[in-house]
UniProtKB/Swiss-Prot annotation:
This is Protein OPG166. GO terms for cellular component: extracellular exosome; host cell membrane; plasma membrane. Glycans are attached at residues 29, 58. It is a multi-pass membrane protein. Belongs to the orthopoxvirus OPG166 protein family. Its main location: host cell. InterPro entries: CD47, CD47-like_TM, CD47_Vset, Ig-like_fold. The chain crosses the membrane at residues 124-144, 156-176, 186-206, 219-239, 247-267. One of its GO terms (molecular function) is thrombospondin receptor activity. Promotes, when overexpressed, the influx of extracellular Ca(2+), leading to membrane permeability and host cell necrosis. PANTHER family: LEUKOCYTE SURFACE ANTIGEN CD47. The gene is OPG166.
C-alpha cells in the first residue's frame, strides 16, 4: 500500500500541465516576446518550436544552450516565474512554441504571422490622390495644346505619349491597391511613380508647340525634376515593409504642384500660335 502511494505521488509530480495561447506578429516588430509563466521552475527551462529545441536554460549551472538557427533567442527575465522568450524578427518563424521544465509543466504559444499594409491608409490615399490629380492635369495640358495649334506629327506624338503615360500609371494603381508588400504591389508602385519623369518631356513638348519656352518654364521644369528626384529617393527607402512614405509623398506632391504651375503658365501667358503642315 505504501509503495502504491509513493508511485501515485511520483506520477503526479510529472503530470503534464499544458496552457495554450495564440499571438500574432508582423514585420513591423523588431523583436518579439513569446510569453511563458511557470511557477517555481525546477532544474531547467526548455523552449521548443514544434519538435526542435530553441533554448535550454540550466538553473543550476546558469548556462544556456541555443539552437544555431535562433542565435538571438534569450529569456526575457530570469525571475522565478517569468521565463518568456525574446527573439529578433530575423529568427522568428510561425508555428507552435512550447516552454516547459523538467516536471512536465508546459506552456504552449501558437505564433501566427499577420501581413500588414505597406503604407498606412492615410499615405496610400494621398498617393492615389496625387497621382490622379497629376494625370488629370496632364490631360488638360495636352487638351489645351491640341486645341491651340493645328494638328501636326509633333502634336500626335504628344497625344500618344500622354496616353501611354496615363495607361502605365493607371495599371500601376490597380496593381498597387491595396498597398500590401508583395511583388505585385511593388511593381504597381514602380509603375505609378517612375513614369513621372516623362511628364517633363510632355511639358517641354507642350511649351515648345505653343512657343512659350522661357526662363519661367525652365524653373517649372527644374522644380518638377526635383520632385521626381524626391520620388525616386523615397521609393528607394520604401522598398521594405513598415516604412514611412513621407519622402515619397513629398516627391509626388511636388510633381503635382509643378503640373499646376505648368498648366497655369500655358493658359495665362499668350504666345504666337504656330501652324504645322
Amino acid at each position: 500500500m505504501l509503495r502504491v502511494r509513493i508511485l501515485l505521488i511520483y506520477l503526479c509530480t510529472f503530470v503534464v500541465i499544458t496552457s495554450t495561447k495564440t499571438i500574432e506578429y508582423t514585420a513591423c516588430n523588431d523583436t518579439i516576446i513569446i510569453p511563458c509563466i511557470i511557477d517555481n521552475p525546477t532544474k531547467y527551462i526548455r523552449w521548443k518550436l514544434d519538435n526542435h529545441d530553441i533554448l535550454t536554460y540550466n538553473k543550476t549551472s546558469k548556462t544556456t544552450i541555443l539552437s544555431k538557427w535562433h542565435t538571438s533567442a534569450r529569456l526575457h527575465s530570469l525571475s522565478d516565474s517569468d521565463v518568456s522568450l525574446i527573439m529578433e524578427y530575423k529568427d522568428i518563424l510561425p508555428g507552435t512554441y512550447t516552454c516547459g521544465d523538467n516536471t512536465g509543466i508546459k506552456y504552449t504559444v501558437k505564433l501566427i504571422q499577420r501581413h500588414t499594409n505597406w503604407f498606412n491608409d492615410y499615405q496610400t490615399m494621398l498617393m492615389f490622390i496625387f497621382t490622379g490629380i497629376t494625370l488629370f492635369l496632364l490631360f488638360l495640358e495636352i487638351a489645351y495644346t491640341s486645341i491651340s495649334v493645328v494638328f501636326s506629327t509633333n502634336l500626335g506624338i504628344l497625344q500618344v505619349f500622354g496616353c501611354v503615360i496615363a495607361m502605365i500609371e493607371l495599371c500601376g494603381a490597380f496593381l498597387f491597391y491595396p498597398s500590401m508588400f508583395t511583388l505585385r504591389h511593388i511593381i504597381g508602385l514602380l509603375m505609378m511613380t517612375l513614369p513621372s519623369i516623362f511628364l517633363i518631356i510632355t511639358k517641354v513638348f507642350s511649351f515648345w508647340l505653343l512657343c512659350k519656352l522661357s526662363c519661367a518654364v525652365h524653373l517649372i521644369i527644374y522644380y518638377q525634376l526635383a520632385g521626381y528626384i524626391l520620388t525616386v529617393l523615397g521609393l528607394g527607402l520604401s522598398l521594405k515593409e513598415c516604412v514611412d512614405g513621407t519622402l515619397l509623398l513629398s516627391g509626388l506632391g511636388t510633381i503635382m504642384v509643378s503640373e499646376h504651375f505648368g498648366l497655369l503658365f500655358l493658359v495665362c501667358f499668350p504666345s504666337t500660335q504656330r501652324d504645322y503642315y
